[in-house]
Amino acid sequence: MTARGIGNSAGPAGECQAVARFHGHREAEGRGLDLPDRLLALAALLLLAAGAWFIGDAAWMKGKAVLAQVLIQRAWAANLDGAKPRERPWSWADTTPVGRLEFVRQRRSMIVLAGDAGRVLAFGPGHRPGSALPGKPGNSVISAHRDTHFAILEGARIGDLVRVENIEGQTLTYRIDALDVVDEHDLSVTEQRGIDQLTLVTCWPFNALAPGGPWRYIVTASRQQDRL
């Protein structure tokens, strides 16, 4: 009730009645939702906040992986030009580009970074230390996350071609021969078999909600004669 409404009351009794009505109105406003309704509203707000955080965090991870490729591409170009020491994508990076993958049918390409630790895979595919460098003789093992760069492997087919550009600028062609699911502790996929091959590794299944898991999806490709 407005001050004008209080002023219209006649005498002290009228003022008391007006004040009583005013306070009664304020008490009614203060009651609003009862306790169960307030708790329900609070729970709904908490759920909305948690959902926004989860979605935002996932979007940030994906965005970081994609946007970092711009800086990584620049470092890769410098390395192809013979940069010594190898160019790093950003000043505090503890990795450097060592190769480039091109999935021919999907028309997608991505730069491979040195190392396969989590801090590397957050920004792109990583080369497993100790395996052959991309485009070099032997078994080159490359890993990436299933929900960013290696999400493309879900659509991989036997017979697909993958081109690999090595640090010297040479481009080699590999043909996908096998698609397998193995236990995370099965290291046979990283073995050197005396042939030139490319082994791509990511977590499986692709639609899993939790990160990691006990299974790995393995795409194996063998080097082809350079006819393309």
Where are these regions (language model features)?
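Solvent-exposed, non-transmembrane regions of membrane-associated and secreted proteins
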Residues: 19, 25, 36-228
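N-terminal Lys/Arg-rich, disordered targeting/topogenic segments
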Residues: 1-35
